[in-house]
């Protein structure tokens, strides 16, 4: 009998009241701020009350460079959390909230798949508890205050040519990348070039995900560089009196959200920065709270390990003082074939030789994660078209690179399909073999940090940048920002900046075409190659297939 679609499986789920789910990890009912029977936010009183608890063990789930459909990282994170609970380890999954952009663009949903899902799936994929709308509103409030300040006399001397803040929208819309605002006459302000990013690329999103509490949130928001004067002096959001109102908009959004897996295990979903154009991790607050209430916390970082895992280690763990105990790299036979040169249309055809050739991508990711001192297990996310010979090939490739590979069937079998993976993860996590350290020191010059990532993670010969980029970095170092980590914005499909360059390329160059100071989030964004901070929709977007049926139920989310 064929397995139902993700949305059909999710609809058949026997969800527990969120209070029952919370009770499994010691969360009392009065600590939950309910959004209906199956969603809740955690109260500040509860978050503060558990800070003295001992931390559980933190497990990162990352992946090889993906196909456009993704390789099942969220599905594996959910499956592993269920698997750990199955073998008696009290476990919480800590995930990012899906963006509407990919839901209506390529993916059609991002709450796991098959029998390894988070529910209520439709709510999570759409508006959820409104956090993204609050982030969008806070971001755009600052944008409105900037233009309003210029309109009413520009007391701070903002140079309209040097406004650093863009508006955002949680949608893929290439038409908004570059616009001219304030057209239509003098009553509408001073026209200037402007543009939109997607909400998940907003610095406000990064700030929310890296803030420890409301006071820290307001401090970071106040430090945002809204723009610069003609003398190139930074104008901060606090100088525009924006940070207080922005904090008010984000007050509830800063509290983590709790939902459940299909097997009724707790999941904290909070924040959702992309890993190709932002830092790609869920909130520090959700992760640290989960660590205080569980034996194990399983979290994921976006796209491949060259992006999400590197940022998880070098930004999130560095800034939050987190020490991961183990990492899981998700690999699929289809993606390895793609890296071995097989066309998308032929990925379902058995081809062990292509798996062998594409295995260099997996081996590179294993080597890279091990550079951080973290033990690695490979999860082979099984598809029905995979052959025994191909799966054996992946195990050989992983073993040669220093990691054990485990076949996982959580999509079809739920926690029963990840029990072996869970036991392997526990073996590594409890062995004490993790010796985590970031890739570079805080004191390293900014461009040297970029170059270090390019050489050691992407295996490039060098990173390049013109004098304007280098001068920006030197200026920020002189202003006291030299200690910040760097956040690389590049394609997710390759180790290089060329999405068509598959496998494990070497001897390539990483061109840095711009750098952006995120003074509130406290990192430097290095924009590499042709990456865009506002995606576009594909020729046939998922939105074409999403609709309500005659019974008023949503169709097309998957």
UniProtKB/Swiss-Prot annotation:
The keyword Transferase does not apply. Disruption phenotype: Mutant cannot degrade vanillate or syringate, but it can degrade protocatechuate and 3-O-methylgallate. Mutant shows O-demethylation activity toward both vanillate and syringate in the presence of tetrahydrofolate, indicating that ligH is not directly involved in the O demethylation of vanillate and syringate. It catalyses: (6S)-5,6,7,8-tetrahydrofolate + formate + ATP = (6R)-10-formyltetrahydrofolate + ADP + phosphate. One of its GO terms (molecular function) is ATP binding. It is an enzyme of class 6 (ligase). Signal peptide: none annotated. ATP binds at residues 67-74. The keyword Nucleotide-binding applies. Its EC number is 6.3.4.3. Pathway: One-carbon metabolism; tetrahydrofolate interconversion. Pfam families: FTHFS (PF01268). Keywords: ATP-binding, Ligase, Nucleotide-binding, One-carbon metabolism. GO terms for biological process: tetrahydrofolate interconversion. It comes from the Bacteria. Belongs to the formate--tetrahydrofolate ligase family. This is Formate--tetrahydrofolate ligase. It comes from Sphingobium sp. (strain NBRC 103272 / SYK-6).
């Amino acid at each position: 009998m064929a397995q139902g679609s993700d949305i059909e499986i999710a609809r058949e789920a026997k969800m527990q009241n969120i209070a029952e789910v919370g009770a499994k990890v010691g969360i009392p009912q009065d600590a939950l701020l309910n959004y209906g029977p199956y969603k809740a936010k955690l109260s500040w009183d509860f978050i503060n009350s558990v800070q003295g608890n001992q931390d559980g063990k933190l497990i990162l789930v990352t992946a090889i460079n993906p196909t456009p459909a993704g390789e099942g990282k969220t599905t594996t994170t959910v499956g592993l959390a269920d698997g750990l609970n199955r073998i008696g380890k009290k476990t919480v999954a800590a995930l990012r909230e899906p963006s509407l952009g990919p839901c209506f663009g390529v993916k059609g949903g991002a709450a796991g798949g098959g029998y390894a899902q988070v529910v209520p799936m439709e709510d999570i994929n759409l508006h959820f508890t409104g956090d993204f709308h609050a982030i969008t509103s806070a971001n755009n409030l600052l944008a409105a205050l900037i233009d309003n300040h210029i309109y009413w006399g520009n007391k701070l001397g903002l140079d309209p040519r040097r406004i650093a803040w863009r508006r955002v929208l949680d949608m893929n819309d290439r038409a908004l990348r570059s616009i001219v605002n304030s057209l239509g006459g003098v009553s509408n302000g001073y026209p200037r070039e402007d543009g939109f990013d997607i909400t998940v690329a907003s610095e406000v999103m990064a700030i929310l995900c890296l803030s420890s509490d409301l006071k820290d949130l307001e401090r970071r928001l106040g430090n945002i560089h809204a723009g610069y004067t003609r003398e190139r002096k930074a104008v901060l959001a606090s100088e525009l009196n924006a940070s207080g109102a922005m904090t008010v908009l984000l007050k509830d959004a800063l509290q983590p959200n709790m939902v459940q897996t299909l097997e009724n295990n707790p999941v904290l979903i909070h924040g959702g920065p992309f890993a190709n154009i932002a830092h790609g991790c869920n909130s520090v607050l959700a992760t640290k709270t989960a660590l205080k209430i569980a034996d194990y916390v399983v979290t994921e970082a976006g796209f491949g390990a060259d992006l999400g895992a590197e940022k998880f280690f070098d930004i999130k763990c560095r800034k939050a003082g987190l020490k991961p105990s183990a990492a899981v790299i998700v690999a699929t036979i289809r993606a390895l074939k793609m890296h071995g040169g097989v066309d998308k249309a032929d990925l379902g055809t058995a081809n062990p030789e292509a798996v062998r050739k594409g295995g260099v991508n997996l081996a590179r990711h294993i080597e890279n994660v091990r550079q951080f001192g973290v033990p690695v297990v490979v999860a082979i996310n099984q598809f029905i078209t995979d052959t025994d010979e191909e799966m054996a090939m992946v195990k050989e490739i992983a073993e040669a690179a220093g990691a054990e590979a485990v076949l996982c069937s959580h999509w079809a079998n739920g926690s029963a399909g990840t029990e072996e993976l869970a036991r392997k993860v526990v073996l590594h996590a409890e062995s004490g073999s993790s010796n985590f350290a970031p890739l570079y020191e805080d004191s390293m010059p900014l461009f040297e940090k970029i170059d270090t990532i390019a050489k050691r993670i992407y295996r490039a010969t060098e990173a390049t940048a013109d004098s304007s980029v280098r001068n920006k970095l030197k200026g920020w170092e002189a202003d006291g920002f030299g200690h910040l980590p760097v956040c690389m914005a590049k394609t997710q499909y390759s180790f290089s900046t060329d999405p068509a360059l598959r496998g494990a390329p070497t001897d390539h160059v990483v061109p840095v075409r711009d750098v952006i100071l995120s003074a509130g989030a406290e990192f430097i964004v290095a924009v590499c190659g042709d990456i865009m901070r506002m995606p576009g929709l594909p020729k046939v977007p998922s939105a074409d297939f999403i609709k309500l049926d005659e019974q008023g139920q949503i169709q097309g989310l998957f």
